[in-house]
């Protein structure tokens, strides 16, 4: 269950959790789905308490109107951020969601080089940048993205579901980013047989 999974992460020493409470794609959205999403978020908040960070990953599954509705539903639970409520290429929709939501909006794992990040920042479409050192162009490129973000009062929570090497690289980069808030890491790596 969501509750038990959250408790397991706490037992592992994590001080924040990120999860996806959504089902399928936007085509399956209904009021009942919205209530189930809210129940999952509530269960995790109950499990981790108020001192542990909680981020919600939308995986770009929602339409703008449904993302706005979901932002309202999860707002009372004190989330760190709502990641990719819509796909990042929909900049105007992301900006609209950010203006209406009362929770931080995050994106960036699917963006490459600093140029699309610049558009996000200029359109005021994001509160938290999730540049991925492996996807966005390497250490220097992510550092440049972070410098741009700082000028817009936007924080950094780098994306990283990869290997221990990319985790180490990301952590070194985090140490020099003034607006760094949290680093994503994976809790398990695929066994070598999965790579064959």
Task: Put a short name on every predicted segment.
Residues 1-100:
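Metal-dependent enolase-superfamily TIM-barrel catalytic cores that perform enediolate-based chemistry
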Residues 72, 78-81, 89-196:
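Shared catalytic-loop signature of beta/alpha-barrel
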């Amino acid at each position: 269950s969501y509750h038990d999974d959250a408790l397991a992460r706490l037992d592992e020493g994590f001080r924040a959790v990120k999860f996806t409470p959504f089902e399928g794609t936007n085509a399956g959205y209904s009021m009942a789905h919205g209530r189930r999403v809210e129940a999952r978020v509530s269960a995790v908040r109950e499990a981790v308490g108020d001192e542990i960070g909680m981020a919600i990953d939308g995986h770009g599954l929602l339409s703008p109107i449904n993302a706005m509705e979901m932002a309202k539903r999860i707002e009372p639970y004190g989330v760190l951020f709502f990641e990719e409520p819509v796909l990042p290429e929909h900049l105007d929709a992301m900006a609209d969601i950010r203006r209406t939501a009362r929770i931080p909006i995050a994106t960036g794992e699917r963006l490459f080089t600093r140029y699309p990040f610049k558009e996000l920042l200029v359109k005021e479409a994001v509160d938290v940048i999730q540049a991925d050192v492996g996807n966005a162009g390497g250490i220097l490129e992510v550092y440049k993205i972070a410098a741009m973000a700082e000028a817009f009062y936007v924080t950094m929570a780098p994306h990283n579901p990869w290997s221990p090497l990319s985790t180490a690289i990301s952590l070194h980069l985090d140490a020099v980013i003034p607006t760094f808030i949290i680093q994503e890491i994976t809790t398990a790596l695929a066994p070598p047989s999965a790579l064959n």
